[in-house]
């Protein structure tokens, strides 16, 4: 099992075409090939914050992913980012953990930006 930190994730992404991966994921989802259960959520009052747990897989793929993303809105008061997160990558056939991606919500930001670009392109046609 590998632990991959945000700085390494950024280097790896610079050599890939994440737009095509996200687009292919949308196509697989629209074709009914994705298993995406409802989002799990933990809410906190003091300090105010929440944690979302998302998970899923594409049928026939090699992996499934569990994403844990949190937002604690007073973190900036203590000098840390409001958003935290990681993704856990497992093999579909064995359940073995292949990698922990300590991305600090970076991959979520990239995915959101790319999804917006794809939608803008498709709706402008």
Task: Locate each region found by the language model.
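N-terminal ligand-binding/catalytic initiation module
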Residues: 1-108, 115-117
